[in-house]
Amino acid sequence: MRESMKSGNFVISLDFEIYWGVRDVLELDQYRDNLLGVRSVIPGLLHLFDKYDINATFATVGLLFFNDKDEMMAGLPEIKPKYTDSHISPYEGHFDQVGRDETEDVFHYAPSLIKMIQQSGQEIGCQTFSHYYCLESGQTIEDFREDLRAAKRIAEKRGITLKSFVFPRNQYNEAYLNVCKEEGISSFRGNETSWLYKAKDADSETLFRRASRLMDAYMNISGHHCHEVTDQDNPGLCNIPASRFLRPYSNRLFFLEKLRLKRITSSMTYAATHGLTYHLWWHPHNFGVNIKENLAFLEKILLHYQKLSKKYVFRSVSMQQLAESLKNEK
């Protein structure tokens, strides 16, 4: 029976950005502990992924690749986005806060961590060059193309070909998909298929939507979000929609941990038994405090994956691996 079942897939993607991903919403001192914790989180994740034979995609902001400030400034795109809200652009004064190199500034550089991920055999994907916001007013599709090309250039300099793409802040913009494909991207992470997760610009987010998503993390409000992954909408570019954001451990909500785990594992089981794909995602900095508790919670998820993989045709694949397997099936 096991051999006759359609294969299900377990996908993990991580939005690797450190301070570039939150610089427009949080002061450095507000989030310092989480960001510093990334230096311990990455080795912890890689250890668990190796232990449970997990393939993951680290969608990395291009600015993290640089070895020093001189290389970074030389690698900036010539054409930069002109957001209506200049505060969200890193090009409007933020580089004055960037230190000389990774030794001096662990918040804006991560070449040693990228090398660690690369050597572990995990996929390094793309989360744009500058944590680019694809739905904000003022920026254009050509700005986006130049940003993506800048990310490709620095990745290629490190021997990495970017094939998988994540929209920063989940600002999914369908109009930009052809640019991704033209620049060599073969898969992207779409948003969950519910009004709760519909892509919006920052000003359109509401407290009700955020509260509803929080409730959905503990109770099945919006469904399992398991998908049959195809490239039918855009041949050659595979949409691998998100299923669940892995929220970090909360000291205030610790009594709901069993519900949070069940919300995830029940959907994983649904994917395994129906030959569908379950896509879990989060940021390494989400695990940056309460590291022990967060990694222990993740290990429970991976143990459940291990059980499912033995009972059903359920495999762990990176975004690139899933896109390649679909291509080979044609």
Where are these regions (language model features)?
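Catalytic alpha-helical scaffold of carbohydrate-active enzymes acting on polysaccharides/glycoconjugates
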Residues: 1-164, 169-240, 257-279, 287-330
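Active-site clefts of carbohydrate-active enzymes
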Residues: 237-253, 283-285
